[in-house]
């Protein structure tokens, strides 16, 4: 319509057209800057696109680094959480607390993946003394909270964090152990951008209080105490009011536990950032054994970097065709604690495998030949119970990288003489057990033909 208005006029200005928001992508300030940079050229590109990297038709404009347009009075924060850990709910309450008790303007947006419970969540919050007109996600936060330590290796959680910003990590590591386990990329970013780093073991605190895996209130309290976006006393008072409103019907015991979570949110510590981290070399690790589609498309998408994929990555898939079974390659390793099998206390009831909602623990029966090649010692297995399993060995194997740490298997395990055969241990201590699972899944043959899989719970778990 604009071009038509000026058609044929001698004084018509130069008119170029472009498209934005392709594939439902955000339109950010950096993309608008690239548009103006294009207009400033002697020969601006016409019919351009922004927000994508088009290496097929070459219509996209060169990307520009994201900038922070919000004023000093606006505070931006991102929270990375695990579906059903309470992070999103806590952040919604935080917005209500700030919006209802101060004159600040608030904005919040919450992103989820398709897994819902146990999946990836990201909360985008803005608070300011002036109206917030940012119609895009938080790309340059002042504060980032990572509520799952495994995310340090899975996602670029420091991306866009401003110079002099603040980072909060929920982790079971402390002090020197934490510094040792942080990825080089993260440590380098901390040093290069003068980031203030705090950490807290909210998982341990929640278990001590009796809240199980619900770390949200502890981390919400830590957020208010660290940022002081509103007075701490006011934040604590309002958090406790929300606790009564949310959990009052569940009894005073539940209320008291959440009160304790608020109070213990102050048990965070600061991690000294070594300036020498700036000299670290970042090496990107890639599994070259995966299929090309997994390496070049699925893994970037799973790493929340799908918007960075080039158009050429989808050549031949214009109709939306997608390979099946891609979830088998994820191996997220997001559980802080996973079960460790103690064969000495196992009665081979298979109840643990029966109750596992993610099939992350399974019984395997190995022949003598299969056992010889297995990455497990024979004396760490049991003689399989059952006449049809004569001469074979039994093992209860855990897929530690797919486990979500719910603890159902430990709860249901009868064990022997009151001692369970399963015990929750830190994920890092069990990573050497993953090859056992991988071997059993790929190399151990199914034994379902040797038993009636419909007879009882135990036999049902040998079905494949």
Describe every region a protein language model picked out:
Residues 16-20, 204, 245-250, 393-396:
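Short beta-alpha connecting loops at secondary-structure transitions
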Residues 59-79, 456-463:
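Short, Gly/Pro- and small/polar-rich lid/capping loops
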Residues 235-239, 248-402, 410-464:
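Ferredoxin-type iron-sulfur electron-transfer modules and their immediate structural context
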């Amino acid at each position: 319509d604009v071009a038509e208005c000026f058609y044929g006029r001698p004084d018509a200005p130069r008119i170029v057209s472009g498209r934005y928001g392709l594939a439902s992508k955000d339109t950010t300030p950096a993309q608008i800057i690239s548009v103006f940079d294009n207009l400033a050229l002697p020969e601006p590109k016409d019919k351009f696109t922004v927000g994508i990297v088009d290496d097929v038709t070459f219509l996209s404009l060169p990307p520009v680094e994201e900038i922070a347009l919000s004023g000093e009075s606006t505070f931006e924060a991102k929270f990375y959480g695990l579906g059903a850990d309470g992070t999103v709910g806590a952040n919604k309450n935080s917005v209500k607390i700030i919006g209802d008790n101060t004159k600040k303007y608030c904005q919040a947006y919450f992103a989820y993946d398709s897994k819902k419970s146990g999946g990836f969540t990201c909360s985008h919050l803005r608070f300011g003394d002036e109206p917030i007109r940012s119609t895009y996600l938080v790309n340059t936060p002042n504060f980032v909270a990572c509520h799952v330590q495994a995310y340090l290796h899975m996602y670029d959680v420091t991306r866009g964090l401003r110079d002099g910003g603040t980072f909060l990590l929920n982790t079971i590591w402390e002090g020197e152990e934490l510094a040792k386990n942080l990825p080089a990329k993260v440590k380098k970013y901390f040093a290069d951008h003068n980031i203030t780093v705090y950490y807290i073991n909210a998982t341990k605190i929640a278990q001590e209080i009796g809240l199980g895996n619900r770390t949200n209130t502890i981390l919400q309290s830590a957020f208010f105490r660290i940022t002081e976006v509103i007075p701490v006393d006011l934040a604590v008072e309002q958090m406790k009011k929300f606790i009564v409103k949310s959990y009052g019907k569940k009894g005073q015991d539940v209320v008291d536990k959440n009160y304790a979570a608020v109070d213990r949110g102050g048990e965070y510590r600061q991690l000294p950032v070594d300036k020498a981290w700036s000299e670290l070399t970042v090496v990107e690790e890639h599994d070259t054994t995966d299929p090309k589609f997994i390496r070049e498309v699925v893994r970037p998408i799973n790493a929340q970097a799908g918007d960075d994929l080039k158009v050429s990555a989808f050549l031949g898939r214009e109709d939306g065709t997608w390979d099946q079974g891609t979830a088998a390659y994820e191996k997220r390793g997001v559980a802080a604690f996973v079960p460790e099998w103690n064969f000495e206390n196992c009665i081979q009831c298979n109840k643990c495998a029966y109750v596992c909602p993610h099939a992350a623990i399974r019984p395997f029966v190995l022949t003598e030949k299969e056992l010889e090649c297995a990455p497990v010692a024979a004396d760490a297995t049991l003689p399989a119970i059952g006449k049809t399993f004569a001469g074979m060995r039994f093992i209860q194997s855990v897929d530690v990288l797919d486990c979500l740490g719910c603890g159902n298997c430990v709860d249901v395990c009868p064990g022997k003489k009151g001692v369970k055969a399963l015990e929750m241990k830190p994920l890092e201590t069990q990573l050497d057990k993953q090859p056992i699972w991988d071997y059993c899944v790929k190399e151990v043959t199914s034994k379902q033909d040797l038993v009636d899989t419909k007879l009882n719970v135990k036999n049902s778990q040998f079905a494949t």
